[in-house]
Regions:
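Active-site-adjacent beta->alpha loops and helix N-cap segments on the catalytic face
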Residues: 31-42
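Central regulatory/effector-binding core of bacterial HTH transcription factors
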Residues: 1-33
């Protein structure tokens, strides 16, 4: 389960699980607690990547706070101070909430006042929407000298926006993303990013689910995995 879910198809899924011979479910979309409570009555559950903090449901995720701190410290050490965050919706996604928190905390610890105008929310994470939002940011009186994006898709959008508005990357503006997906090495310049251990998360989620199916009395577990900073051309010159 990893697509955007409406209330209607949530009920469809609950009914489907109730009426089918399903042994367990790995959830990759943040679900409301009441929905998780309904699902866990019907089948073993493991949350993977996105999660809601529920005492009796396991999850595997990454350390979004530390990953953000890692990227911000790298950019700050490169001498950039006016760092913008292009994020998904913190009210909707746990990872976006944690990355916003890490962004604000790291800047404050560096003695830099967070500029609300440098926090851009792109709720759908869409490339075209992000290009428009970042272009608007670059047209302001105080454009950033670095842009940290919550995904590589939005970082690619930042590269496009910089090109449209006449900014050089990385000379004028550093650009960094998150995820280390294929697009990060398909752009010019290549995108500095945070590598998520996607294989490990998937493997651990399935292993945890299988152990819960084998032993229904097994207590829930939480695994928070580390990430890796991948430095590429969009910040390195």
């Amino acid at each position: 389960m990893n697509e955007t879910l409406s209330k209607f198809n949530i009920h469809q899924i609950i009914n489907f699980i109730s009426q089918s011979n399903i042994s367990g479910v790995v959830i990759m979309q943040k679900l409301e607690i009441d929905v998780l409570d309904q699902l866990k009555l019907r089948t073993p559950l493991v949350q993977c990547s996105e999660f809601n903090e529920v005492n009796d449901i396991s999850y595997i995720t990454i350390d979004n706070l530390e990953a953000t701190r890692k990227m911000l410290r790298y950019i700050l050490n490169a001498g950039r101070k006016q760092i913008a965050l292009v994020n998904s919706d913190p009210a909707r996604y746990t990872y976006a909430k944690l990355r916003l928190q890490g962004y604000c905390e790291t800047l404050e610890q560096a003695g830099i006042t967070v500029n609300p105008l440098h926090i851009v929310t792109v709720p759908d994470g869409n490339f075209s929407t992000a290009v428009s939002a970042i272009s608007a940011l670059l047209k302001t009186a105080s454009p950033p000298d670095a842009i940290f994006c919550a995904s590589d898709i939005m970082a690619a959008a930042a590269l496009r926006a910089c090109a449209l508005e006449g900014f050089r990357v990385p000379q004028d503006i550093m650009v960094a993303g998150f995820d280390n997906i294929d697009i990060s090495v398909m752009t010019t310049p290549n995108i500095t990013t945070i590598n998520q251990p996607r294989h490990d998360m998937g493997f651990m989620a399935c292993t945890q689910l299988l152990s819960m199916i084998a032993d229904p009395t097994k207590l829930p577990q939480r695994f928070i995995l580390d990430t890796e900073l991948i430095i590429r051309e969009s910040t390195d010159f």
